[in-house]
Each structure stands twice: as structure tokens, then as C-alpha cells.
Swiss-Prot record:
Broad class of the protein's primary localization: nucleus
Protein's name according to its UniProt entry: FMR1-interacting protein NUFIP1
Any one Pfam family match given in the protein's UniProt record, by short name: NUFIP1
Taxonomic superkingdom: Eukaryota
Organism: Mus musculus (Mouse)
Length: 484
């Protein structure tokens, strides 16, 4: 048997590549790179030769020696790139492999090569400065967060052009004489005989529509006399202090004569459009008058039977038509009759409300229709309860007690039903009553508005004269009774 070799570094393996291997064109590397990496596994065992198997069994496993003149070996833990992956680390009992075992169980996750990798790229030489612009940057910036050049420039304010020539009728300006002359050559005259207006063709069309179209008022201001007359008319209507005082005096004189009414101004006023009607229904605090009337009626019911005989409140308004108030006022024969109760049906539709308001609207004045005292079923039932709870005056009490028990049972059933209905209404947030639409003026009424005003003023003057002169002698009788 051969003597074992001393425990020294063996000679470096021959790095000259064999012909035909991929490492032919590999450039020479530094020696420290090889020492920083783990050595490759030993080559596979060939078929045993006679006499060699016994010598291998006797020789221990020795590490190869570094080449002469090479640097001392580095620890593998110093260079993190040279460390094997976690799945390639040897188990704790792997140290016995260095003490004489023949086969290693070490398997690397990536193959190790002394030269180039199989794909032709050198290992551990990747460049980290790629000139590619990343796609996750916004388009308004570079990779270095720089704004583009066109955004850095501030927008300059444009200077207003300076015009030296003007056309007053067309309201246009021109920079030189040539453009002004070409524009003046395009002027045309108004096609009307008495009109001397001349301007551009489009402006002449607007002028004809506003001044000479059928139905338009013709204003002639050609002569200085017409201009002076037009100015005087404008000055009369201008609201100076003298004109205001003059108007006040005229109004006082008309009031003394009895001409109180004025011509109704028709058009898109408050209360005429559909949107204002919907706003009144939606906002109960500002415009909803049905609820205020209902609250007043509830207070009247709580007072007792004497409140039922009292007159309904008449809204006091300064601008109410006097003739309309006379028409709506009750006559003496109506006062003698008993007041009838008006009960609203269970299902009140908007069509029914509009029909009721149209029947109640008699006057053609601009005053609002007078509200009729409407009582709900709950209020009528409450009144019935008050009437039944009062002590009876007739001697036949047995008959009344039986009728009272029947009526009380009916009243309790109706009250339970009304409670359910009120709960449903509270949940649905629906108003119990719909406000009727205001009377929209007809075309004939709008055309005859001045004549209607004049006739009513004449009637009011007659009424005023009768009262002032005591035509029927009513004041004399009252004076005589006072003296007696």
C-alpha cells in the first residue's frame, strides 16, 4: 500500500477546456472568484481497476491544493453571492461525508459551471443601470420626475388689438384703411321706403325684424322735432321726485271718487306656474293654507257648541276686490238657515279638488278663492262624541241608552279604523288634502281686463255715493234711536 499523502493543499485542477466544450471562448477569470465559490462535486466513480480499489479504501479524502501563487481562500460567508441556496445546504450529519464517504448528497438548486453558463451569458455580471423608461411613471413626468419643457413655459397674455378705424352701426374696428373700405362697400340700405338705415346685410336683417316686421311699433326719429317729442314722452315717465308726487295725487283723487281697482297684470307671476303649485304642496310652512285652516277648525271644535254658531273667519287682505267680497258674503236668508257640515270623502283626488274649487270660484277678480270650512271625519266623530256625552233632556232614557250603546260601539270601531288610517298616512308622509289649483285667467278675460276694471270702478263709485248721501235713510233712523 502507498503511503498517505501529507495534509497539504493539492495542486489546482487543470482549467484548460477540452475542445468542443462551451467554455472555449470564455475569458480568463480572476483566481479569487474560484476560491470564493464552493468546489464542484467529485466526478462519478468509474469501473474499479485491479489494485486501485484497495488503495482508495485506505486513503482518506483530502481537499485539493490551491495553485502556486494564489491568494488565500475566503470564507464563503463573507461573500453572500457565493453562498449556496438554502435547499442546497448540507444536513448536520453531512460532515461525515468529508471523513471518507465516497458519494455526496449535496444537490444545488442551480447548476455550477467553471466557465460560461449554457445560455451563453456570464454569471454574476448583470447590469443594474438599464436605460429603459419604466411604464409605471405618469406620462406627465420623466423617470427622474421632471416636467416636460412645454409645461414650464408660462402662457403669455395676448395684447388687445389696436384699431384706428371704426364702424359704429356694425360695432366693428379695423387696423388699416383698406379693410375699413372693403367693409363699407358691403353696407346695404334698409328695404323700407321711409327708413334710411344702412349697415351690413346681417345687421339690416335684424333691424327689419325689430323695427319693420308686422306687429311692431313704428318709431320715426328722422326729424329733430320727432326726436324732441320722443324725449319729452320719456321724461314724463321717468321716476323723478316731481313725477312721484304727481302720481300720488292722482291716486288720492281716484280713491276719493271710488276708483279703487286697477288693471290686473297678467303673465308669469307668482302662483300661476305649475312649479309654484307643487312648491306650495311640498312646503307646508310657507304656502300651505289648508293645514292652518285645519288647526284653526280644531281649536273651534274644542270650544264647544257655541263655537259652531260663530261665523268663519274672513282673511283680511288689503288688496282684496270689494266686489268679490260682496259676491262671497252671505245674505240674510243664508244666515237664518242652519250651517251644514261638509265632510271630506275618504279618497280625495286632485280632479275632485279642482272641481270643487271651480264650483266655488264665482268672481272673475284676481283675489284668491275664499276657503270653505272643511272638516275631516275625525272632527265630525269627535263632535258626535261630545253631543252623545252630554246629559239627555228627554224623559225617555231607556230608548236613548240603547241607541247610545249602539252608537258608542260604532264610534269605537270607526275610531280604531281612523287610527290605522292615520298611522298609514304618517308612514307614507302624504298630505291628507290636496290644494286646489288657482284660477288661471282665460284669453277673453285678459283681453277685456281694462273694460272689466272700468265697469267695476263705476259700480263702486255708485255704492260710495249711496252711502255718502244716505240714499236709503239708514243713518237718520240710527241717530233717532240714539237720541231716544
Amino acid at each position: 500500500m502507498a503511503e498517505p499523502a501529507p495534509a497539504v493543499w493539492p495542486s489546482a485542477p487543470d482549467l484548460t477546456p477540452a475542445p468542443g466544450t462551451p467554455s472555449e471562448a470564455a475569458p480568463p477569470r480572476d483566481n479569487w472568484v474560484y476560491w470564493a465559490m464552493l468546489p464542484p462535486p467529485p466526478p462519478p466513480l468509474s469501473s474499479p481497476v485491479a489494485g486501485s480499489e484497495q488503495s482508495r479504501k485506505g486513503q482518506p479524502h483530502v481537499l485539493p491544493q490551491p495553485p502556486s501563487g494564489a491568494l488565500p481562500p475566503f470564507d464563503a460567508q463573507i461573500l453572500p453571492a457565493a453562498q449556496p441556496p438554502f435547499d442546497a445546504q448540507a444536513p448536520p450529519d453531512a460532515q461525515s461525508q468529508f471523513s471518507g464517504q465516497q458519494a455526496w448528497n449535496l444537490q444545488a438548486s442551480t447548476p455550477w459551471y467553471w466557465g460560461l453558463s449554457p445560455n451563453g451569458f456570464s454569471t454574476y455580471h448583470t447590469s443594474y443601470q438599464s436605460p429603459v423608461t419604466h411604464s409605471y411613471f405618469p406620462r406627465s413626468h420623466d423617470a427622474k420626475f421632471n416636467l416636460p419643457q412645454n409645461r414650464k413655459q408660462k402662457t403669455k397674455k395676448r395684447k388687445e388689438p389696436v384699431f384706428h378705424f371704426f364702424c359704429d352701426t356694425c360695432d366693428r374696428g379695423f387696423k388699416n384703411q383698406e379693410k375699413y373700405d372693403t367693409h363699407m362697400s358691403e353696407h346695404t340700405k334698409c328695404p323700407e321706403v321711409d327708413c334710411s338705415f344702412s349697415a351690413h346685410e346681417k345687421i339690416v336683417q335684424f333691424h327689419w325684424r325689430n323695427m319693420h316686421a308686422p306687429g311692431m311699433k313704428k318709431i320715426k326719429l328722422d326729424t329733430p322735432e320727432e326726436i324732441a317729442r320722443w324725449r319729452e314722452e320719456r321724461r314724463k315717465n321717468y321716476p323723478t321726485l316731481a313725477n312721484i308726487e304727481r302720481k300720488k295725487k292722482l291716486q288720492l283723487e281716484k280713491a276719493k271718487r271710488g276708483e279703487v281697482l286697477t288693471t290686473t297684470q297678467y303673465g308669469k307671476m307668482k302662483g300661476m306656474s305649475r312649479h309654484s303649485q307643487m312648491a306650495k304642496i311640498r312646503s307646508p310652512g310657507k304656502h300651505h293654507k289648508w293645514r292652518r285652516g285645519g288647526a284653526r277648525q280644531r281649536a273651534v271644535v274644542g270650544l264647544g257648541n257655541h263655537a259652531r254658531d260663530s261665523k268663519p273667519e274672513v282673511p283680511s287682505k288689503a288688496n282684496v276686490d270689494p266686489l268679490g267680497a260682496l259676491i262671497h258674503s252671505d245674505s240674510e236668508s243664508d244666515k237664518e238657515e242652519k250651517a251644514q257640515r261638509t265632510v271630506v270623502p275618504k279618497e280625495v283626488t286632485p280632479a275632485l279638488c279642482s272641481l270643487m274649487s271651480s264650483y266655488g270660484d264665482v268672481s272673475g277678480s284676481d283675489s284668491e278663492p275664499e276657503e270653505a270650512p272643511i272638516k275631516t271625519e275625525a272632527e265630525v266623530l269627535a263632535e258626535n262624541h261630545v253631543l252623545h256625552s252630554s246629559p239627555p233632556k228627554s224623559p225617555k232614557q231607556n230608548v236613548q241608552t240603547t241607541g247610545r250603546t249602539v252608537s258608542r260601539s260604532k264610534w269605537e270601531n270607526q275610531r280604531n279604523g281612523l287610527r290605522k288610517i292615520s298611522l298609514k298616512r304618517k308612514k307614507s308622509h302624504c298630505h291628507p288634502l290636496f290644494e286646489p289649483r288657482t284660477h288661471h285667467p282665460y284669453l277673453l278675460e285678459m283681453l277685456l281686463a281694462p273694460d272689466i276694471r272700468h265697469e267695476r270702478n263705476v259700480i263702486l263709485q255708485c255704492v260710495r255715493y249711496i252711502i255718502k248721501k244716505d240714499f236709503f235713510g239708514l243713518n237718520t233712523d240710527s241717530v233717532k234711536t240714539e237720541e231716544v
